[in-house]
C-alpha cells in the first residue's frame, strides 16, 4: 500500500499533531505517481511547507517487513533528497529553538549546501540523525556538522559504525569527543542510552508494547518526541522517556503514522 512517510515527515508529524509550533520544509518532485501522491498528502498537513519541483521526479521507499516486525528499506532517491538554500530564504527572520536534519540528505550531491545552511541557520540547537549510512558520509561534512554541537540521535548499531567502537558506551564517548554535546542512542525494547556529558551516561528504560506489528518510522517518531519534550522544557532524560512511550505505540501500528485514536491516547496534544 502507499503511505506518506520519511524521516523528517515522521519527526514533524509527532510535533505538529501534538500542537507544537513546527515548520516542515521538504522538496517534492511532481513528476510520476509518487510525487503526486506525496504532494496531495502533504497538502493536508497544516505544518507542512512542501517545495514543489514540477520538472523533477519524486522517489519512494519500499519497506519490507519481517515476521518479527523488523524492516528493510529499499529507497529510490528523487527530488525529496535534494536541497537548495533558496528554499529557506522565507524563513530567515524566524527563530527556531530546535532543527532536525538526517544523514540521508547530507550524503547527496547537494548535502554540502545543506551543511553550509546549517552553519548560519536561525536554529539554536540541531538534532542530527546520521542514520544507518552515516558512517559512509563524507568525513568533512560530518565534521562540519559535529562542530555545530548537535544532539545526536541514532541507534546503538549506528553509534558503533559511526564511531568505529565496539561497546555502546565507548561509542557514545568517542562521538561526544567530536560533538561536545549530548547523545541519545535507541536500543530497541530496552529503551535508550543517554549521554549527558563525558561523566554521565544513563539508561532510560523502554516502554512495553502489547505487540510489535512493524518498526517502520519508530526511530523517527522517537526523535520527534525527544524534540517535543525538549521544546516543553523537559530534561533530555525525561524527553527520552516520553519518546520511548511514543515509540512503543508506533511499533504496535502498521506503518509510520499513528491513527488519530492512537495518537490521542498518548495525551501529547497541547492547544
PLM features: what roles do these ranges have?
Residues 1-60, 269-270:
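Substrate-binding N-lobe of the ribokinase-like
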Residues 39-53, 59-60, 65-202, 234:
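Ribokinase/PfkB-type carbohydrate-kinase core domain
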Residues 6-7, 30, 60-62, 70, ...:
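Gly/Ser/Thr-rich helix-start
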Residues 2, 28-29, 105, 162, ...:
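Residue-level marker of alpha-helix boundaries and capping positions
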Residues 15, 155, 219:
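Short, conserved phosphate/pyrophosphate- and ester-handling motifs at nucleotide-, phospho-/glycolipid
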Residues 168-271:
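Conserved phosphate-binding/catalytic region of the ribokinase-like
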Residues 1-3, 132, 213:
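A short acidic, glycine-rich active-site loop
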Residues 19-23, 70, 233-235:
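Short helix-capping/linker segments at secondary-structure and domain boundaries
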Amino acid at each position: 500500500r502507499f503511505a506518506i512517510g520519511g524521516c523528517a515527515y515522521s519527526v514533524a508529524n509527532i510535533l505538529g499533531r501534538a500542537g507544537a509550533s513546527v515548520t516542515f520544509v521538504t522538496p517534492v518532485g511532481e513528476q510520476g505517481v509518487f510525487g503526486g501522491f506525496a504532494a496531495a498528502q502533504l497538502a493536508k498537513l497544516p505544518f507542512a511547507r512542501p517545495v514543489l519541483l514540477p520538472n523533477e521526479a519524486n522517489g519512494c521507499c519500499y519497506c519490507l517487513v519481517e515476521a518479527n516486525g523488523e524492516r528493510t528499506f529499499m529507497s529510490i532517491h528523487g527530488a525529496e533528497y535534494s536541497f537548495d538554500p533558496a528554499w529557506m530564504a522565507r524563513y530567515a527572520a524566524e527563530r527556531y529553538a530546535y532543527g532536525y536534519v538526517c544523514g540521508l540528505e547530507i550524503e547527496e550531491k547537494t548535502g554540502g549546501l545543506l551543511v553550509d545552511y546549517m552553519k548560519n541557520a536561525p536554529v539554536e540547537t540541531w538534532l542530527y540523525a546520521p542514520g544507518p549510512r552515516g558512517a559512509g558520509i563524507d568525513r568533512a561534512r560530518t565534521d562540519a556538522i559535529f562542530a555545530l554541537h548537535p544532539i545526536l540521535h541514532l541507534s546503538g548499531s549506528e553509534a558503533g559504525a559511526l564511531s568505529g567502537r565496539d561497546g555502546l558506551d565507548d561509542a557514545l564517548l568517542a562521538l561526544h569527543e567530536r560533538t561536545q554535546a549530548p547523545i541519545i542512542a535507541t536500543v530497541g525494547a530496552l529503551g535508550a542510552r543517554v549521554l549527558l556529558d563525558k561523566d554521565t551516561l544513563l539508561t532510560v528504560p523502554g516502554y512495553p508494547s502489547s505487540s510489535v506489528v512493524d518498526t517502520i518510522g519508530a526511530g523517527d517518531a522517537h526523535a520527534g518526541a525527544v524534540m517535543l519534550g525538549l521544546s516543553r522544557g523537559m530534561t533530555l532524560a525525561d524527553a527520552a522517556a516520553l519518546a520511548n512511550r511514543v515509540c512503543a505505540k508506533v511499533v504496535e501500528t502498521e506503518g509510520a503514522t499513528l491513527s488519530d485514536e492512537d495518537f490521542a491516547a498518548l495525551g501529547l496534544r497541547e492547544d
